[in-house]
């Protein structure tokens, strides 16, 4: 445990060789799942780091609502603790946090991968729900209580805070996204919680962004297609930038209306 912004926080320090990749978990989750997804596939080229955000996993909660801006502050504090710039891979809430962190401190972020993320809460196809009673809640609360210093009795409060967050944040605009100054890969399932229109709007708004929509997949795309998702992410993190393609349109630095598309 280390102190981030005065709060005791569980961290996983970088191990191995290569650039640092910081894994940012989703809401009502913790770093364990992200480490399982990426440990074997990325550790040969990168040093993986992670931390559990306030009220998640092994990090205790504190009074007050959850806010993405505060989560980004936590992430900035963690990157400053590491003492070097890092790639970010964030899933769901972690993707929102990665985006905000990249906007706030591009000097600390090499590249950012946003998986199943949204830039505005109205981009969600359905309103997030989670039961506060019944078998599904009981199972989640049991797992939460086994890990959290706050114990199982705090589980309902965390769910309430998370649902309130999902319903009201983030509130970014495409004009905000246009200020992103680090390379970004946006990844989603073709049946994700954010609409494809919302995901594509994010892709169009972020300068130089790359987009990967994986077929036959949902918000659990990292679990459903781990090999494919990891290959795409690894290629993005290791590739030379800026991207060059045979028939650039969006990426063309100069375009003339009516220029023929190369014969492929």
Model-derived regions: residue spans:
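Short beta-strand/loop motif that positions the catalytic acidic residue
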Residues: 180, 186-188
């Amino acid at each position: 445990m280390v102190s981030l912004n005065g709060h005791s926080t569980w961290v996983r320090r970088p191990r191995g060789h290569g650039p640092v990749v910081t894994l940012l978990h989703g809401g009502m989750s913790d770093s364990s799942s992200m480490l399982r997804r990426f440990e074997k596939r990325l550790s040969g080229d990168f040093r993986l780091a992670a931390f559990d955000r306030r009220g998640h996993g092994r990090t205790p909660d504190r009074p007050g609502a959850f806010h993405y801006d505060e989560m980004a502050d936590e992430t900035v504090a963690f990157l400053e603790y590491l003492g070097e710039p890092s790639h970010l891979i964030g899933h769901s809430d972690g993707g929102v946090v990665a985006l905000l962190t990249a906007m706030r401190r591009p000097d600390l972020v090499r590249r950012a991968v946003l998986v199943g993320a949204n830039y505005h809460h109205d981009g969600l196809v359905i309103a997030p729900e989670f039961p506060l009673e019944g078998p599904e809640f009981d199972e989640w609360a049991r797992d939460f209580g086994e890990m959290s210093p706050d114990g199982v009795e705090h589980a309902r409060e965390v769910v309430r805070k998370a649902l309130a967050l999902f319903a009201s944040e983030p509130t970014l605009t495409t004009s905000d996204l246009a200020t992103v100054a680090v390379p970004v890969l946006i990844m989603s399932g073709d049946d994700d919680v954010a609409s494809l229109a919302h995901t594509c709007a994010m892709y169009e708004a972020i300068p130089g962004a790359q987009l990967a929509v994986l077929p036959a997949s949902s918000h659990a795309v990292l679990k459903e297609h781990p090999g494919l998702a990891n290959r795409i992410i690894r290629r993005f993190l290791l590739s030379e930038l800026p991207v060059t393609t045979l028939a650039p349109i969006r990426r063309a630095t100069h375009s003339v209306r009516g220029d023929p598309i190369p014969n492929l």
